[in-house]
Amino acid sequence: MTPCTRVLLSATALSVLLGSYSAAAPRGVELRVLSSRADMVTGGAALVEADAPAGKFNATLNGEDVTKSFRPGKTPGTLIARVEGLKAGKNILEIKSVKGSAKLELVDYPITGPVFSGPHQKPFVCQTEQAGLGAPLDEECTAKTVVTYVYKSTDPPPAGGRGRGAAPGALPAGFKAFDPSAARPADLAQTTTSDGKTVAYIVRRERGTINRAIYEITMLHNPSDPAPDPWTASRNWNGRLVYSFGGGCAAGYRQGLPGGALTDDFLSKGYAVAVSSLNVFGNNCDDVISSETMMMVKAHFINEYGAPVHTIGTGGSGGAIQQYMMAQNYPGLLDGLMPQISFPDNAIYESVIDCSLLDHAFGSTKASWNDDQKAAVSGYATWKTCSDGWMSRGTATSLANNQVKAVACNAAIPKTLAFDPASNPSGARCDYFDDMVNVYGKDSKTGAARRALDNVGVQYGLKAFNSKQINFDQFLELNQVIGGHDVNGEIIATRDAADPAALKIAYQSGRVDTGGGSLNIVPILDTRGYFDMAGNLHDRFRSMVTRARLTAANGTADNQVTLMFPPTGTAPVRPGEQLAMMNQWLDNIAKDTSNASAASKVAHDKPAGLTDACWTQEGEKIVEPLTYDGKGRCNQLYPAHADAAIAAGAPLTDDILKCALKPVNAKDYSQPLTPDQVAQLKTAFPQGVCDYNRPGIAQQRVDGVWHRY
């Protein structure tokens, strides 16, 4: 990691991170950027706000007059300008009046990026044609911006609606193309927004490219009304923006396709929706690129439509990871988080890789194992969680392979560009760490990215052994054969040993969620269905891991509410209802004029009735605080489990990438050991075993925010 800058954050500083203020002016004139930070403007344009000068004033950009760009803003006493034509690098915006003067430096970057994520990943495969945007205009995968309209039909959608096999760009079930020049269709639906307005369900759909990603922005808008801009918002928009993040985890080297922005639950209530292909972890699992892309798309949104009252994140699995990591590492981009089936961060790779190692080891031991014993060692409710092809190495691009195997490239990457140890050793390496090479840097010996991957001293199956679910011979042999990975991600006999620099980078740069940044002051509504028994990695205890980390970092997790749904059937609280709760929570905070701290406000201003809860299969709501091993009906209905690290003694925070070691000691085991057995364990663990009563090696809280690479 080579961060050029980092910002140390306080609650006060957060409020101005995305509204970059000028130096204090002697007579009260002030300039600020609404669309982004002043030092991270993109695409040659920025939306700026000034206190309205008394009488005449003059505004210049790099010495050129831009006074006419300023027009009255929504807030009394302010002027807003969309300042365009910025040159790459530093620009000076200045405003003068009899009231005083103010000067603001704007630093502009190309709309193709990068801004803070480091050098662009190469090779990079364009996919604009697959997205229906035509051939790319340049090597940065640029496409022309396209604006079209669609509408919601009152006709019943076809059976099945739009399935997974639908063509890219196909409209979701119930939506049809709308021709503004034609007569209104007879099946045009009406909808009532959160503001109580009943309007025609017509959606403006903008698609284009930003930061080499394909983006889409949608909102209710009648095309017979004036085109929306920062001074004339669509009268059907409720002023809020929902940013949707997609799941998965893959190494990138391609543009990818975005998730859908035609989300009925959100659009029907008047919310604007934004998505981008590089905010889908299945296209690229680099959370820094995700944050950068989101920042740039949001800046474009503000330049075109005006600043939203709130920006709310939503998305499941990898989409949840992006929200949590963005709130920690790039605070100010999201005002509220709505993660579903969440994980706290990308360090989930440890759980995934442990599964593949265990799956391999169980097939390599002389001892026999039944599935209950395997499950006990893994920590999960069922061994199916690990043996599933997505978690093991059953498919070439399974999640396990995507984490460590350099050859696990997406099919969109031509074989001539992809890494092959024999035929193309200089090709694109498609594991997680090489995807994040701008953050971790390269190992000078191998040329591959440094890895924060380690299982030295981990006693796999420790709790299962202590509880007599497995015997000593099984415990010993498993830990003798568990192994690790070579530089290309192939399983070898030697355990993984993390690069010391990579460990430090992982914690300091925020690749591990440590509850920093804005994670103590943003509202979090964490929802999930109960999938533990289905053999699904998205299990219940992940929300508890995040709760434990927030509590460890901040002394409380009062800004997080968790809702637990039954494993089957329709969720008792629909996404639109969840969004309404989040919006009310944010509205309450905005109206709170007390002198309380931001952390106190977010805890105090929850909507009435919004609290930890679960629902029975029959639909009964049970209000109970989230606990890992406590009593209560929710834990009886939906027991929480663990992963292999916790089953080996790691804490619930599950945030130790490399454990501190201690000597093997017979007193640490519940089953009695003979001197020969102790000697065998010492041979199996020559460096010692994990001491989880101590912090991990290099473990620390995130060091500042808004890192550049």
Locate predicted features:
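Bacterial N-terminal signal peptides that target proteins for export
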Residues: 1-9
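Bacterial N-terminal signal peptides
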Residues: 10-19
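C-terminal His-loop and adjacent cap/lid subdomain of alpha/beta-hydrolase
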Residues: 25-709
